[in-house]
Amino acid sequence: MKRVVKFLMVVVAFAAAFSCAEPDLHPNPYLDVTANNIKGVWRMQSYDNGVQLAEGSYYYIVFDRAERSFVSYDNLGSMGQHTKSGKFDIVTDGAAVIFGDYDFGLGVNDWEHRYYVRNLTKDSMVWVAVDDEELVTVYVRDELPEWIEKRQ
């Protein structure tokens, strides 16, 4: 009888040890959309659903998690650099949506669109305008070039 009990205990222990679920071989590569996960420097890689920036053009946005603020640097639409700052927020009621406003010193202006943030990884993210799903912008993680910092 003791032999049978020991045998059953070994079988149960063996089953418990080897019946665990298999590890997920294809884990979700995407991060939760939070201020912590988007903090840092991002460079616009493409806009309007795949249009690349013209040679010499740039758009960088730097997110500060603690202050929920941003500073953007670009030379789009003009010869010189534009530096804009403001506040942002993220809501995650179903889909993650980022929105914000610019502080121009004369008052606050909302961003032109609110954006779904999709496919956020440590290296890239995709923004899709809530009111125009054809307006797709891809950002990649980067560093702010020194020459931009000097022109602030």
Q: Where on the chain are the PLM-derived regions?
A:
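Lipid interaction determinants
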Residues: 21-85, 93-152
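Bacterial N-terminal signal peptides that target proteins for export
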Residues: 1-8
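Short beta-strand-centered aromatic/proline hotspots
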Residues: 88
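C-terminal motif of bacterial Sec signal peptides marking the signal peptidase cleavage site
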Residues: 16-19
